[in-house]
Amino acid sequence: MKKMFKIILMCSLLLTLSLSAFAKKKLYVGTNAEFPPFEYLENGKPVGFDIDLVEELGKIMDYDIKIVDMAFDGLLPALQMKKVDLVIAGMTETPERTKTVSFTQPYYTASQVIITRKGENGIKSFDDLKGKKVGVMLGFTGDIVVSKIDGVKVERYNAAYAGIMALKANKIDAVVLDSEPAKNFILQNEGLEIAQTEGAQEEYAIAIRKNDTQLMEQLDNALTEIKSNGKYQELINKYFK
């Protein structure tokens, strides 16, 4: 009986080891689901362009993608502390960020725009923000841009939607946000418009830990493949057309 038990136990262990050998590696992906259409919550689950994109990259690289939603200003610290393996969150590569993390090739080009109430306060350009109270997303490019304008009172929010609600409630004069999320909020909120001006173009990229050269190569190769096989354009058409 003992011998039979040992045989069964050994077979179970061998089966477990065999299955684990074929199991996909997990890749933990940090994001901030407050940035539609790139990442947002739907029925409590993060979805959006960035989420679909990283899922497709995972298929090419043979990784099981696990999405970890958190505050935007916590993403890079989480990456450095190895709580996640990479970050995709409509994040722009900036000189300040590249001091601590590395970025893949760009996957999307955007720009900063100004959202105002229709027909109010004469804001037509970034120069017109002087002396105004302006909402931005904490740590986003808009925060960096507006903070450099003299005479602006910057109101920082953890979610873009909170800034939009503050604008509608007359608590602030404008919101500076990336172009595609801004268009998304305009469609959902009557009485708001985008000023006919845009800031300098910026490029979104995936952040990884410095010196993680193997993952960098895998991601860059997968991005190149997805841009050439038609899948990237499918995602563009799905979320932006």
Model-inferred region functions:
Residues 24-91:
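Extracytoplasmic small-molecule ligand-binding "clamshell" domains
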